[in-house]
Amino acid sequence: MSEFSQTVPELVAWARKNDFSISLPVDRLSFLLAVATLNGERLDGEMSEGELVDAFRHVSDAFEQTSETIGVRANNAINDMVRQRLLNRFTSEQAEGNAIYRLTPLGIGITDYYIRQREFSTLRLSMQLSIVAGELKRAADAAEEGGDEFHWHRNVYAPLKYSVAEIFDSIDLTQRLMDEQQQQVKDDIAQLLNKDWRAAISSCELLLSETSGTLRELQDTLEAAGDKLQANLLRIQDATMTHDDLHFVDRLVFDLQSKLDRIISWGQQSIDLWIGYDRHVHKFIRTAIDMDKNRVFAQRLRQSVQTYFDEPWALTYANADRLLDMRDEEMALRDEEVTGELPEDLEYEEFNKIREQLAAIIEEQLAVYKTRQVPLDLGLVVREYLSQYPRARHFDVARIVIDQAVRLGVAQADFTGLPAKWQPINDYGAKVQAHVIDKY
């Protein structure tokens, strides 16, 4: 914001000495806004006491206040605003009793906050940035030209202080107003969702998209001009480096750089925060829809039970068996006794060791297909191997055979996209689906 030349104790003493105070209840604030609106329609910017009373009458009717004491209450309101330095009163001896009123800078500032600053305009922001860019370029050119102290004050310091800095403050104020608008939109969305959220979904989407679009327009406009503004500020800063007596310009440039960085960074941060809120609202709506489905079902079921004797019904439900995956990649061979002969050397060994031995044997035997370039039909090969082992080990042996086979090569038929035929690999219903491996 603007730089203050007074210290905190000085400002406090000044405010206490002048007895500054502002008290604006909603009816008085509405009266001030009405005065500002009517004043904006006049070319001279002046209003008579009768016009102020008419404006107060409109406000009084809107608040449904009695009209019997309208004159007294209007006079009290006008005097109170004059005392609070919101209105200036001008009287003359020639027109005694017909005073002229003008809004003070404080009154204009308050009404401007509530009226003129409430609407965001990309065109207005673009014009402000265009003016700033022009002022900065002229100041940078003047700084590079150099000159005496008067030259630096008039052509560099003054434009930066009284034009660029004020426009930066105006842009900063626009961002702060956007912050308030975001909070107001959040309150509106909360009220909509608390009432009839189904009917409010479209309204919520509109509010969310409008606010997102406004924030994005603001940030895009700032980022488009930000680099050029920073470049001109750096030009001025470079020009002051060789002058020891220009600390006041260098400090002002540093403040402007910090202010511009803060404006751009907060714009992006505001967008990020709004995106997070947008996702939160959509998540809430999806959750509410899911919960509402359950509530609708429960309500219908409750009504059906209550009216069962008048309208009998039958309930059919399906309870499918759960599918359990009994396969385990690290599962050992079954411990129970199985039929068939097993070599004594392998009887008490762990399956991992058995698997290594089987893999080595099968790899050596399958290598013949690759050496001779003979097609390898997995269905026939697996069936041949499984016939040598008991049923309890068929799954493990088949997995080893297939693992070793696919390492040798691929089936060209796999690239056609056509599925292979299922082939039985034992007498117990096990099948395998694989093309013939013909490319090693």
Curated annotation (Swiss-Prot):
Recorded hits in Gene3D superfamilies, A to Z, give: Chromosome partition protein MukF, middle domain, MukF, C-terminal domain, Winged helix-like DNA-binding domain superfamily/Winged helix DNA-binding domain
Domain of life, per lineage: Bacteria
Q: Name one Pfam family in it.
A: MukF_C
- Does this UniProt record's set of keywords contain Cell cycle? yes
Subcellular locations according to the entry: Cytoplasm, Nucleoid
| Record function comment | Involved in chromosome condensation, segregation and cell cycle progression. May participate in facilitating chromosome segregation by condensation DNA from both sides of a centrally located replisome during cell division. Not required for mini-F plasmid partitioning. Probably acts via its interaction with MukB and MukE. Overexpression results in anucleate cells. It has a calcium binding activity.
What is the protein name for this chain?
Answer: Chromosome partition protein MukF
Its source organism is Escherichia coli O9:H4 (strain HS)
What is this protein's gene name? mukF
